[in-house]
Amino acid sequence: MKKETPFGAVPRYLVGDNGPSVVPGYDKANFGYASISPIIPVEARSFHTVTLTYTVGKLGIDDTGAIRVCWRMVSDAGRPQMDNPSGENFVTATSSGEGSLVLKFEQLGGQRPWNETLTIYQRGGYLKEGDIITIVFGDKTGGSPG
């Protein structure tokens, strides 16, 4: 029989998927919102282009802020890369605001099961309400197949 810790049993809300406990809020006006296009069925292990558009909320993003896109480690998604525009799975990000964006992919960057993460850091300026960050997965403009 397991003994309880001095603080009692681990609360149920701390066990399992952490999504609800780490979401900063659901208010689109304050935190912004994202949309993905196109939303269509795709064949596994085929190349496509998908655009994620994030609209900044009232709180903005400062010059050290970031947004993060996470997905499950077990998937048929290719590994995103930002170094070779003609290579497979090339990813780009642009914003309508000040400064520049820096992208970082980590295969073990999130908490299970959302291990794979793409973090988009804001540098050298601020994003204000209504500014747009556009992330293109499989950007074909440099010759990538998607």
Task: Explain the meaning of each model-derived region.
Residues 1-146:
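Ser/Thr/Pro/Gly-rich, low-complexity intrinsically disordered stalk/linker tracts of secreted
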